[in-house]
């Protein structure tokens, strides 16, 4: 992305105000109990609730082009049978705190202080942002989504002073040798491509005060 375009993105994002639409997925006591079970199984922690202290903002794409289809993947409380890559790791369905449409519309799907299942090893200390797009693992997120993500990470930093990192899903394994990594199953890893290095480079070029993934 050119320096001129980045300048206009910074200028526009400073002036832009966003509404966060409340679009809650189903999160009954059943999902809470499944989350506790996941925490015990994968992190070796016995918890009374599923509240988190976020230190990482984890950026994703849905790998599905439509908002309604993307949202539907998170609605069920139990994991569908078409996810053999993660089915063995528990019946808790995936979830995310936010979803951003192609036009930049922002939806909050679940409480920000609840743990969602959206990344191996880092769920217990991260907030997830899913961006609609990336079908076929193509880096095709929009400028509107970039602007919305800039707004969201700054909004979340104001809400949670504990947040330090803004990281792409494809970078999650860079945390394996850090204190933030909690996964106990050495055989539970998947290869991720989202949202891709270009989007993360543009995002970090337009935000300040956040650490990148410790990949070097």
What is the predicted function of each stretch?
Residues 18-33, 135-216:
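Basic/polar, cationic surfaces and motifs that engage anionic cell-wall
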Residues 40-106:
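Short, conserved "active-site rim" segments that organize catalytic pockets and cofactor/ligand binding
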Residues 50-52, 91-92, 119-122, 138-146:
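Solvent-exposed, acidic/flexible segments
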Residues 57, 120-129:
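Short coil-to-beta-strand
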Residues 68-74, 109-111, 121, 178:
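Short, solvent-exposed loop/turn and secondary-structure capping segments
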